[in-house]
Amino acid sequence: MPIPDVIPILLATGNSDKQQAFRSLLNGLSFNPVTPAEIGVSASTTEDGATHEAIAIEKALAWSDAGSTLAIASDGGLVIPSLGSAWQSRHTRRFSGPDVNDSQRVDDLVELMEPFSGEERNASWAEALAIAYKGRLIASWELLGATGEIARTRPSGPIPEFWVFTIWNFPQLGKSYNQLTPEELLSLNDHWTRLSRLVRRFFQSIFVPPLD
């Protein structure tokens, strides 16, 4: 069903990089993306769900309820099979502890992977996305993206908020994930490319705009 008017949708994160990722997902659709800061809302979540999808749903429900609006939220993490139980993708950002900066997280993961070689260094990205309206879930997805490998050394220069993407390499392209062009991301059929298709299909074919 076509969306008749521009509808506000809350980007349920304070992370500017993720806000930009959400904007790219919604680009061309009849929505007005707004940030929590722009509408003056906040929400608290535990983020202790058993899956990325459960965590994304928790975020979407909390933020959509806090803002009394439509909200889109996500949760993701790096899947590193060789580390087994020593690594949980859900704790990618927090694996070094709560008070560690992104630069130290890069160093810690590089050190953790030092004993591994070849395919043992392979890693994929799991990403979940959820959409809710005023505390009610209306859609959610979780998928596993392309496979790259963990770099042996940290990159030079400042580390962005999505720190792990600076050491998640794609040797066939000679780049880390954060250096890939839109065309290269498309060629990899990466997680955001696939989520974009799902989101667009949902909003263009399934979504019924709220009446209140």
Question: Where does each model-flagged region fall?
Answer:
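Anionic-ligand binding patches
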Residues: 2-10, 17-212
